[in-house]
């Protein structure tokens, strides 16, 4: 039996809902013999990572998958890399707005996802749901968490694997926002469930085209 911790943020930036939180609430508690535990985290500098750290310590998952909203994206975006910088375009939910600050002074400049990102992307698209590999998780709390969890694993939770997936707005979030893409909660749920199934079943990622020119 393997265990995965799946995190989702609370609403931020004036939104009333966050699709990341909505989708994790709908996840099953098990896939086969493997366990899924969900965790709501605040869209807040430092506190988000601290909450995950406590849960890793108590739950001892094999994998940690964090989900975040990326308004404006057209598909499910499986993130490749997290960078050691906080440069918040907007304030977080407690008014913090660090600019050009390192997340951890003793951390590497960047950490790569240790999840099978291309196998995840391939299987999601095979099921008729748009998905791609993303090479930037931004510089807001999503990247903060992606980097922070990878840092914690490198420093104190050796052997665990983690990564991050961004998802689009839900249709109800784009009312009055002309030409802004969205995805149904059903399709997001299918995509994230597939991602978890692949995380449980694929040890080594596949090799396939997934890069970008710029």
UniProtKB/Swiss-Prot annotation:
Class of enzymatic activity (EC top level): hydrolase
GO BP term (any one): proteolysis
GO cellular component terms listed in the entry, alphabetical order: cytosol
Subcellular location: Cytoplasm
Residues annotated as the enzyme's active site: 79, 142, 166
UniProt cross-references to Gene3D superfamilies, sorted A to Z: Peptidase C15, pyroglutamyl peptidase I-like
Classification via InterPro entries: Peptidase_C15, Peptidase_C15-like, Peptidase_C15-like_sf, PGP-I_bact-type, PGPEP1_Cys_AS, PGPEP1_Glu_AS
Disulfide pattern: none
Reactions catalysed, as given in the entry: Release of an N-terminal pyroglutamyl group from a polypeptide, the second amino acid generally not being Pro
Metal-binding is among the record's keywords: no
GO MF assignments: pyroglutamyl-peptidase activity
Family matches, as HAMAP family: Pyrrolid_peptidase (MF_00417)
Family the UniProt entry places it in: Belongs to the peptidase C15 family.
Protein name: Pyrrolidone-carboxylate peptidase
């Amino acid at each position: 039996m393997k265990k995965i911790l799946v995190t989702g943020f609370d609403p931020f930036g004036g939104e009333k809902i966050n699709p990341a939180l909505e989708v994790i609430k709908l996840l099953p508690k098990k896939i086969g013999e493997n366990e899924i535990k969900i965790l709501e985290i605040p869209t807040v500098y430092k506190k988000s990572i601290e909450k995950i750290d406590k849960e890793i310590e108590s739950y001892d998952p094999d994998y940690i998958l964090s989900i975040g909203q990326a308004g404006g994206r057209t598909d499910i975006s499986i993130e490749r890399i997290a960078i050691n910088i906080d440069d918040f375009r907007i304030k977080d939910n407690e008014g913090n707005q660090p600019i050009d600050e390192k997340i951890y002074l003793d951390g590497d400049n960047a950490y790569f996802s240790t999840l099978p990102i291309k196998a995840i992307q391939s299987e999601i698209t095979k099921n008729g749901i748009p998905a791609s590999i993303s090479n930037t998780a931004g510089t807001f709390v999503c990247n903060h968490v992606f980097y922070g969890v990878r840092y914690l694993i490198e420093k104190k939770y050796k052997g665990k694997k983690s990564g991050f997936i961004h998802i689009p707005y839900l249709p109800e979030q784009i009312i009055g926002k002309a030409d802004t893409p969205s995805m149904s909660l059903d399709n997001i749920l299918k995509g994230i469930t597939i991602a978890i199934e692949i995380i449980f079943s694929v040890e080594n990622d596949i090799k396939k085209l997934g890069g970008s020119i710029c």
